[in-house]
């Protein structure tokens, strides 16, 4: 077992019995800061090979017994269930309950689980420990508990609101994402969960993060609802210098969509957990970056000071856009990060990784500061993450947003009305918004467009779209070198008034 250099749960239980005591993020931060001053200890697995080597289908057979949910016998709307170790979830995490007077370790027992056809020796699993946990809450119906939070693996967590299904993930911290040196994945090694009162509508979770070059203390306040909001506070300490620190990272999947259609016939028009990165820059500009599944690793960086927000969104909720009855991509949430306070100078970065199927999370977005403190110095970040299906509500009524981006072979209509390809690529971008819908259809809306050195805009037209009551931009571009990426931007204006967010698109190389 890993040597623990801090107070054991038993000692903590003895110390924290005073009625004046209250557990806080500072208690976790003391441990994180202490860890940062010592060498990293690689977590050790105690998992028998029958569990470590199992296939996903076998792991799925291990189910938590719902009748034994933690807090099942308490008058609280929140319940806890736990994940068993198995496959690559092969390292135990400690989970503690925090009450008004004490901290209590929640001990693993195989009796919490049903194992299906998985053969195991009870004596070898009696002290295994949990892989993670999930939170249940009656979010859709008062008489049914639904899973709303899942914390499993590294520093990943997934959250949903009412009427949503799991999609993208959030993380505690990302280190050296997309760098040649390879990414480092910090992990939550211990959790403290406050026992909620019967009338509580929020749940507080603390976590201790550890990795070879960073440690951290986290406080998550989960507020379930139509939109489930997670209030996050983190105190981060570097053990050693890092190439890139990713704060408030989001991880998602994009396989194909109308801006990058499937290369093979597929009954599903789109397949993704998210289809764009939205940014509210410090200067007030809104940016929409449609996602791609590139043939080569792509990193986009948006420099700014004091970002107002960013997120990976799933725009377009019509079932007909996905046609998937099993995975219901139309119900998967968007995640929006709202910083608290000033985060200073840095960049919102988007990483797009090639993938051949939907089982790989190939999209990452995060904030990376320009300047990092010396190892051991504390960094503080506070923000909320909103998991929502109401993406249009992010924007003020007078700020139109991109409803969809479609890509097509560029062509020109001949005198005989036959369309003839002309070697260009056409982008069809529909804008809509609350105030835009009120504009007369003869409003002289135009587009401000630009393209990088690797392309040329051959034609750009804007016309009223009576179906969406918005405006459609059609832009035909010619790429100079197909082996290079091509950057382009566009926004709608009426005279000197900007009507929309900025559409910022990168045409991947070799497309």
From Swiss-Prot:
State which gene encodes it. mdoG
GO terms assigned for molecular function: carbohydrate binding; catalytic activity
**Species of origin:** Escherichia coli (strain K12)
Name its pathway.
Glycan metabolism; osmoregulated periplasmic glucan (OPG) biosynthesis
Q: What function is annotated for this protein?
A: Involved in the biosynthesis of osmoregulated periplasmic glucans (OPGs).
Domain observations: Contains a large N-terminal domain that would serve as the catalytic core subunit, and a smaller C-terminal domain that would act to modulate this enzymatic activity.
Q: Read off the SUPFAM superfamilies from this record.
A: E set domains, Galactose mutarotase-like
Protein name in UniProt: Glucans biosynthesis protein G
Subcellular location per the Swiss-Prot or TrEMBL entry? Periplasm
Keywords assigned by UniProt, alphabetized: Periplasm, Signal
Name the protein family: Belongs to the OpgD/OpgG family.
- GO aspect biological process, one term: beta-glucan biosynthetic process
Instruction: Show the taxonomic lineage.
Output: Bacteria, Pseudomonadati, Pseudomonadota, Gammaproteobacteria, Enterobacterales
> What is one term from the GO cellular component aspect held by the record?
outer membrane-bounded periplasmic space
May I ask which residue range the UniProt record assigns to the signal sequence? 1-22
